[in-house]
């Protein structure tokens, strides 16, 4: 009897152990599948970054300079090898004066924004999508429409992200104040091709043309301005060619003090987050 009881208890323990082991195996399989899935997703995202590197960076190469622009020698050297689009960025306050119904005074609303001024070649890669669906160059005043007498109408338009409209309580067609300049909101930014390459952002984007930005009066000695130059190679460049071009630029101007990025690493911060 004691032997039978011992055998019966042993079989019961064995059955319970097998059930527990099955649960362990199931958990192990789920863990392996989860790790494999995350790895595959990470590889897909990194591959997407590499394939869209030109659009994300805005060029094959980019140059960033603080507090100064390219000098004549640097610009001439680069223009012989690349198509160039220049832009500059700074943070600024934007204000809107909106008259409320039955109010004696206007209600002042303001917001901190990421201000970006672009030239007529922007963007070299990708598409700047806005609403309404008009040519962004016209919306920014980079291509001025002609009046009846044949003269160009100077229009320093502003393109803004939707969140700024909500913050200021305005809509397309209203006017915003940036620095000492007033700018009509001519469109809403739906997609900015090189937005991811800029890294950390603390406010909505506002796009102006370079002449309009100077009209704002914000660009003064000591202003914290980041000057960017997107470069599109005249001939196709491989990954090795990009690295060689970067070395060539630094050797040609060793004291330039610029930061150069390649399309293969268009957004380092995003890549680190994914990996």
Segments (PLM) and residue ranges:
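Membrane transport/envelope proteins' first extracytoplasmic loop
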Residues: 3-275
């Amino acid at each position: 009897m004691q032997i039978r009881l011992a055998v019966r208890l042993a079989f019961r323990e064995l059955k319970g152990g097998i059930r527990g082991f099955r649960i362990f195996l199931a958990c192990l399989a789920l863990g392996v599948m989860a790790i494999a899935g995350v790895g595959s997703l990470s590889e897909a995202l990194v591959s997407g970054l590499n394939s869209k590197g030109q659009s994300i960076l805005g060029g094959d190469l980019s140059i960033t300079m603080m507090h100064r622009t390219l000098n004549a020698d640097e610009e001439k050297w680069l223009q012989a090898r690349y198509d160039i689009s220049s832009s500059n960025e700074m943070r600024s306050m934007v204000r809107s004066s909106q008259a409320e119904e039955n109010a004696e005074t206007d209600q002042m609303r303001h917001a901190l924004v990421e201000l970006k001024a672009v030239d007529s070649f922007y963007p070299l890669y990708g598409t700047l999508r806005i609403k309404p669906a008009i040519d962004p160059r016209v919306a920014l005043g980079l291509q001025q429409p002609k009046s009846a007498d044949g003269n160009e109408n100077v229009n320093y338009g502003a393109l803004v992200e939707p969140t700024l409209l909500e913050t200021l309580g305005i809509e397309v067609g209203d006017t915003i104040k940036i620095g000492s300049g007033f700018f009509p909101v001519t469109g809403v930014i739906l997609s900015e091709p090189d937005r991811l390459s800029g890294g950390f952002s603390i406010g909505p984007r506002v796009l102006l043309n370079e002449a309009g930005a100077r009209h704002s009066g914000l660009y003064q000695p000591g202003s914290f301005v980041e000057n960017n130059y997107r470069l599109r190679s005249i001939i196709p460049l491989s990954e090795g060619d990009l690295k060689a071009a970067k070395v060539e630029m630094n050797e040609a101007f060793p004291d330039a003090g610029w930061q150069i990025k390649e399309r293969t690493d268009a957004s380092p911060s995003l890549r680190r987050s994914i990996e």
